Amino acid sequence: TTQLLINLYRAGDTKYFHALKVWDRYSSQMFLPHALDGEAFLPLFQSGDAARAVSLSQKSPLRAGAESIAPWEAVYRKLTQFYEDDAVPLSARPEIMSLKQELARMILGTHPEFLDLAETYFTQEDLFAIRNRIIGTGRIGGKAAGMLLARSILKREMGESEYTRIMEEHDSFYIGSDVFFTFLVRNNLFRLKMQLSRGAQISREEYEEVENRFLEGHFPHDILDQFQNMLEYFGQAPIIVRSSSMLEDSFGNAFAGKYRSEFCCNQGSPEERLQAFLRAVKLVYASALNLDALSYRRKRGLSDRDEQMALLVQRVSGMQYQRYFFPPLAGVAFSHNLYAWTNRIDPSRGMIRLVFGLGTRAVDRTGGDYPRLIAISHPELRPETGAKVVKYSQREVDLLDLDRNDLVTLHAADILAGRDYPNQHLYVSLMKDGCLIDPSSPFLDGEAEECVLTFNNLIRQTGLVKIIGRMLEILARAYGRPIDTEFTAFIHPGGRVSVNLLQCRPMTLPGLASLQVSLPSNIPRERVLFRSSRIVNGGVVSHIQYVIYIDPQRYHDAPVPVKKSLGRIIGLINAHPRIQQGKVLMMGPGRWGSSNIEQGVNVHYADINNTSILVEIAREESGHLPEVSYGSHFFLDLVEDEIIYLPLFPNDPRAEFNEAYFQQTPNQLAGLVPEAAEYDGLIKIIDAHQDGRMIQVFADPKTQQAVCFLE
């Protein structure tokens, strides 16, 4: 047995040391790459530095197994022979081009628009580099392909020098889609997948049993060996296992947030790290059969498509601070801004949803917590002013606790309390004597009462917004349509910005947003149910039969177990055949889809996907506040399904909220869904047909006004 295996190498003028195997010893930094600084080897904690160093140590981190006779291996070997031959005849060029196209199809997929872009922007060297990091065989899936294509586009259009200066290495591996298929067959899960994909219904409780069956599964020894090779390469650097299915992030189907991603802190002995990684892989595989993913596929007529799951395994972008690992900046960025809260903003320039720490808080809908929304055309403008800047700021941070070996959420104030986090003056403003002040130097005032994450100095003093804006412009031009991205960013000493582009996909715009919608005038006041402002997407929905109404005050007073179960009950109602056949208006307190049940109803995509209008009722006395959450996976679901989102402020006289109609109209819940009868006082189903009426909604995205009334 090898007791000590060390990789020593030089890159440029720097010498590196990386322990791959150490028998019967362990420390928290033992398996990190180290760089020689003077007479000492120092660990590389920043992800970009580590990725750059380790990627130079070997051409292919995965040790070769037995030679495969798979067709794509034959194509790869033939193309490699041509590439390494210095005297390729001119007559061979058509064959080389055909082989390159075939290898791209075998690795990346078959979508014509994507392959056209791949033909333009991927070189043979790019395809070889991808091939050298594929575990098993098969395609790498939509998420991985989209990320790699976006990087190739930026590299070509920016030029090598600018690209290298700005972009952080992504340092990724790809678990081929054939590994998923093999895992299903080997562990008697294939029939289950076919049954669920083709229409069998499953509850969230039953899905837990599906997860358990996946967790009991096993991989072939050759795949386990490659997993081990990859983990030796990463050492103790945190990694993330991300879904990358064949249909994910494709043209027309985003699958935003439908599948799972799992962080691995990657601490402990090699065997402990392997077991944690295997658990993460199995959980992501199981998410191919979760209720939201199945509902999404059915709604888009994709149930009969063979949705194979590849995986994208990436080094987590960030750096260690105390016992935690996280990026200082993360977010989502869109080349088109659907949420222009003032007419000064140019929607075509795009927008950013920015957070401190892991980007999970940028894409998930969290209670009582708000990212910074940045309109790229006017980055210093905010939707909020005055005291509301503090109220609508980020208060919690997601990060990896290396001691606990787990993903945790902490108060931002606790992380920033020491006032010594690098570049903290760029991220926070200081509350002093009731006023919010932007730091004038890197040395923060120790007498300030509170640090508030505003990112004001970051926006003014660095080139981050300009860099993101340029990236979005280049990518949207290459794609020929709006795009959305996920990223992390790091500010180096001296202010230089580096960005790690983690994801890129075509962006879905609401089909009705560009229509001219004129709100009807002279509607008798007794027929108006409510008026709404600050809307994002618009359109006209006529002949609405059902209203699913959750009373805000009764929700506020409901016990916690009832609030926790409410999402499941809404899902039952949503799945009822009569609800599916009619047009539906859903109304409830605070933020639908929030992870915090005190802030709103904790529903998932499959619980609301049959609605036409979603209304968030904001009663500040109950602590319920709507939030557009532009850029979150929840919001992208609304846009993609053309569900009109309307915030309602009953205390605003202009809202004309006819609360009496919703309280006094008879409740059809018990008759329609008898198993939900005990929720009769909290949930109301109104059938407008009972009075021979229908409900109609007009929403004008240009004036950001909407009206709902009885026809």
Each model region followed by its residue ranges:
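An N-terminal structural lobe/cap that precedes and organizes the functional/catalytic core
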Residues: 161-169
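N-terminal leader/propeptide and maturation segments of large enzyme subunits in energy/redox metabolism
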Residues: 189-213
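C-terminal regions of RecA-like/P-loop NTPase motor modules
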Residues: 25-64
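C-terminal regions of proteins
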Residues: 621-663
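Conserved mixed alpha/beta core segments that line enzyme active sites in large multi-domain catalysts
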Residues: 114-117, 121-161, 217-619, 671-672, ...
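Phosphate-binding/switch region of NTP-binding enzymes
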Residues: 2-39
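An acidic intrinsically disordered interaction segment
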Residues: 98-121
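Eukaryotic intrinsically disordered, low-complexity, charge-rich
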Residues: 57-104
